[in-house]
Amino acid sequence: ITFLCWRDICRKSIMNPKNTGIPMIDKALLFINGVPPKNLPETEDYAMIACSDGAFHYLKEKNFPLDKLDFISGDFDSHLGNDEAIYHDRFIFTPDQDKTDFHKSLEIIQERGITAVDVYGGSGGEMDHFLGNLTAAFLFKNHLEITFYDEFSTYFFAPKTLVLENVKGKIISLYPFPLTENITTKGLNWPLNNESLDISKRIGTRNLASEETVVIHYGKGDLVVFVEI
């Protein structure tokens, strides 16, 4: 997926995941402890690569080049065994139990001047973890452009105007967080025209892109968009 983003508008293309529109000098790759990706992404162009202590285990099992990790964060309740001695200089101990490992990793990434993060391992498994990750992303959405990837879709908090390209035939879901008002769409099989979505009444899941380009605009609230990969 390609990202060309500004403060209030974002253009995303499904064709080329490497051409993101954001200088890679400002972009991080983060692995957290959800369901591991079946295929690891290419890493050479990221400014920073990091993982939680739990994700370290599946990266090792998948023969990920661990020397590329800039830091490993967490409370280290997942013991790393002999690897502790090898990679101890990259450990960042974050014992605060009031924050998730994902939240603490985002704090470190933001402190180091990064503006965008691609996240793998954010979904699947225990659903409370997924909801916690989504909430952490919400807290950082004005500071970091966070995009999640899993086996089925990519998802993110959308700006007020979002343009999706090369998406014809793909499932597009609009999820209010928790209320999104004045939504207007173009290029969806079931369009919205200045309508609202409310988590307690109506959500916009499982829509379908009827055109190659889909435009989503909304007024008040926050909106999570899921795009089928």
Give the role of each language-model region.
Residues 16-83:
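N-terminal beta-strand-loop-alpha-helix module at the start
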Residues 136-167, 172:
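Class I SAM-dependent methyltransferase SAM-binding "motif I" and its flanking Rossmann-like core
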